[in-house]
């Protein structure tokens, strides 16, 4: 089905009902969703040895960073070198920097060896969007007296592995030399041994300060090696050394050391390596061109990041310089930032009180399906595929892709043939994309089933074709032909029959009245006219198709019956008082006379030609009466 915005609902008999249902869908969807995306950050925060005000300014700038074309507060922060005493300070700084965002610290563990060797790993996440599964946490010894932490986060409302992020936050052994590289490799092996036990196809993030010096270092290659936990590098596996690759570097934003490490910006120590499912464009997935070394403009190789002007924010030198100064004073690493697409949030609605419904009719019971995930840019919403099926009482439905609200996708259902009287039914909508929040709905409804109308030219049986003949003298003016239409077998469990359109008329034939009539137990009357003026003697006929519909309810069906009208002119003396030309003087003609009552010179109802239709003409009419 094709998705449609709210203002494109077609005009139909159920527009009001559809608008109400759509409004419910939108309100329910927005009420159940928080405006969020997953901006993921890792940053070696250097034991808080930097300027706390500068650290706060960096956090502020992270939330305002619109270099990818949009800005959003970080949803996941993976921090290194966090001491036991620094943890609370970091929480306070973050709360001041990005107020109103409910941040939660995930399981935090620190051993005495970690506290004395640079600090531990800390994970902070948005609790309105994500939740930690504490049982998924694990400490993995990875050398240099430090542990790598494994955390398990799930997007709220999801119940499958596609909604889970496995995050390994690490700080591998520092310094060059083969012995240090070997310690890093052993640590990477320990992490991979753990990751390879996770469910196949898991969303895995390896993030932190790797301290690797090149793309040929064994620890780096270990993360990329074959196996269930294999990772890919968002920046590719080519060399990152030298000025040509300055845009990739993360350490150090300072030349001078002091309480922080100096040396200039010439190393790529900080990484987010991702498992293949995080590149597939489904569920959690890296958004193209969003992986970046925060504040690095690529023009500060082996110098301080605030040397001269910085151009990280294109065309905004002052803003870029302000960030560069904050990065310089905050830490001896700069953050790595990446933005992820997020799985959908399914929402759908079906009118729960359908009222009267034509069984076996058209598919006009509509379920509306949408993705209620509120993202700051549509590109951040992963496709939300779904399937919608009826329970057998309702039939129809199908598969589709749910668009972001306020647009919606539609699936149509009909009431199965043969259902009359009160009924209950349901539609099951289930997400088929991975990681979707609120992935299943069982939409219940009820109504009153009715049979389709049965149009007929006869009241005793179904007759859908007939011929009606009339005779008239020449130049008798307009004659009328009355044809009854029946709704055979009507009862309170059968639809009324609405007479809508008469097509095919022409050549002097026209419909005078009867269209718009709703036929139930009593027949409706179609009155056709034929203008005999100027017609030669002979037979005139026309084939007419009557389009009728069931009453204006879900399942409304269109019906067609056909009629041949034949008028023969000549060879018949006019019958005085027969105003409708049917050869009889009866109540129909009396009605025409009364309708012309009053001054009416030249009217056929003025039988005594005195210019007035009055009691004298009524007396003559009764004298001509044939019954």
Where are these regions (language model features)?
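Repetitive helical segments and hydrophobic/amphipathic motifs
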Residues: 26-27
């Amino acid at each position: 089905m094709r998705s449609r915005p709210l203002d494109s609902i077609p005009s139909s008999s159920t527009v009001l009902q559809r608008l109400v249902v759509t409004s419910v869908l939108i309100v329910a969807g927005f009420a159940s969703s928080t405006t969020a995306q997953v901006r993921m950050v890792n940053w070696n925060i250097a034991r808080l040895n930097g300027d706390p005000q500068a650290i706060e300014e960096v956090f502020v700038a992270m939330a305002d960073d619109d270099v990818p074309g949009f800005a959003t507060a970080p949803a996941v922060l993976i921090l290194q070198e966090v001491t036991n005493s620094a943890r609370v300070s970091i929480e306070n700084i973050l709360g001041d920097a990005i107020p109103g965002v409910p941040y939660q610290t995930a399981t935090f563990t620190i051993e005495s060896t970690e506290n004395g060797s640079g600090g531990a790993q800390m994970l902070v996440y948005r609790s309105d969007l994500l939740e930690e599964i504490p049982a998924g946490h694990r400490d993995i010894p990875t050398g240099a007296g430090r542990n790598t932490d494994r955390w398990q986060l799930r997007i709220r409302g999801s119940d499958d592995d596609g909604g889970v992020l496995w995050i390994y936050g690490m700080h591998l052994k520092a310094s060059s030399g083969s012995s240090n590289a070997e310690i890093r490799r052993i640590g990477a092996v320990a992490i991979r041994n753990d990751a390879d036990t996770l469910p196949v196809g898991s969303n895995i993030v390896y993030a932190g300060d790797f301290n690797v010096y090149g793309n040929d270092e064994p620890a780096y290659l270990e993360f990329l090696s074959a196996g269930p936990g294999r990772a890919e590098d968002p920046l590719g596996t080519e060399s990152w050394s030298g000025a040509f690759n300055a845009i990739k570097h993360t350490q150090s934003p300072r030349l001078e050391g002091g309480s922080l490490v100096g040396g200039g910006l010439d190393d790529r120590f900080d990484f987010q390596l991702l498992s293949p499912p995080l590149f597939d464009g489904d569920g959690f997935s890296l958004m193209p061109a969003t992986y970046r070394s925060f504040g690095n403009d690529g023009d500060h190789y082996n110098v301080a990041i605030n040397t001269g002007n910085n151009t990280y924010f294109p065309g905004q030198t002052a803003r870029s310089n302000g960030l560069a100064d904050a990065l310089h004073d905050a830490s001896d690493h700069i953050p790595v930032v990446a933005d992820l697409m997020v799985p959908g949030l399914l929402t759908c609605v079906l009118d729960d009180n359908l009222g009267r419904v034509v069984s076996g009719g058209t598919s006009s019971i509509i379920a509306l399906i949408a993705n209620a995930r509120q993202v700051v840019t549509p590109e951040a919403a992963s496709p939300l595929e779904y399937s919608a099926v009826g329970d057998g009482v309702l039939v129809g439905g199908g598969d589709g892709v749910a668009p972001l609200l306020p647009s919606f996708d539609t699936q149509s259902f009909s009431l199965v043939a043969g259902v009359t009287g009160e009924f209950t039914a349901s539609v099951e909508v289930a997400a088929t994309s991975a990681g979707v929040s609120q992935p299943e709905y069982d939409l219940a409804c009820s109504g009153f089933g009715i049979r389709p109308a049965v149009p007929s030219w006869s009241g005793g049986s179904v007759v859908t074709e007939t011929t009606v003949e009339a005779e008239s003298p020449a130049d008798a003016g307009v004659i009328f032909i009355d044809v009854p239409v029946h709704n055979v077998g009507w009862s309170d469990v059968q639809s009324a029959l609405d007479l809508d359109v008469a097509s095919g008329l022409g050549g002097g034939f026209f419909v005078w009245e009867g269209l718009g009539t709703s036929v139930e137990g009593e027949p409706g009357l179609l009155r056709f006219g034929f203008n005999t003026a100027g017609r030669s003697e002979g037979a005139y006929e026309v084939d007419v198709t009557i389009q009728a519909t069931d009453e204006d309810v879900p399942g409304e069906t269109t019906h067609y019956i056909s009629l041949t009208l034949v008028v023969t002119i000549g060879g018949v003396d006019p019958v005085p008082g027969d105003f409708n030309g049917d050869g009889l003087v009866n109540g129909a003609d009396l009605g025409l006379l009364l309708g012309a009552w009053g001054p009416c010179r030249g009217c056929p109802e003025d039988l005594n030609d005195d210019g007035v239709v009055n009691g004298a003409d009524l007396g003559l009419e009764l004298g001509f009466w044939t019954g």
